[in-house]
Amino acid sequence: PVQNVFEATLNSPNLVIHLAASLLNLSKMESSPDFRHYRDGLTPGVFRLLEAMEEEKQAVMSGMGYTYVRSVDFLHSLDQPSLALFRELDGPTGLSHRYLTEDAYAGVNLMTSLAAPARGQTPIAQALVTLASALNQTDYAQEGLSLRTFGLEGRSASEINDYLETGELRI
């Protein structure tokens, strides 16, 4: 079990994988009608960026007092027959795909806003949100889910966790 909804959100593998890999594969996505994210898009260079995202996620989760679960390990075994479904999933097909829109808006943006109370740094995640914002002409940092969205901006990690567990903000 997880402590709260933020811990569950941060432990989603999508947060680490979707936005980063999609941005690095944008030209392939737009030019290849047969592009498959998990078959075609996970190159050694992409894995390096995913590992950097893992480090940022781990720092934020540790600072928030959450249990950290690595996201990218299963990707190294995608050639296993039991994971064939992942390799054949379509797309993403372009900028409006949920791997770019939802993950910039929700998971990755939330992680960047948790960096301050967690005393962590998220320059890679912030850069990904900035790139997705420019490409989709949407300011995900302002419009996306963040501590500000939930009225928790400026709160400490313990105050945030308290609120998520009790529904009460203590002054």
Feature names for model-found ranges:
Residues P1-L49, M53:
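Substrate/ligand-engaging "lid" and interaction regions
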Residues P1-V2, G65-V72, T122-A125:
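Short, surface-exposed acidic
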Residues N4, R36-H37, R70-S71, S156, ...:
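Short, solvent-exposed coil/turn linker segments
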Residues V16-H18, G65, R119, Q137:
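Residue-level recognition of short, structured coil/turn motifs
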Residues N25-E30, E55, A59, A106-S113, ...:
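Generic structural signal for well-ordered, non-membrane alpha-helices
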Residues G41-M53, R70-S71, S96-D103:
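Alpha-helix N-cap/loop-to-helix boundary motif
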Residues V46, A52-E88:
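Small-residue-rich helix-loop
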Residues D73-I171:
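Long, low-complexity C-terminal extensions of enzymes
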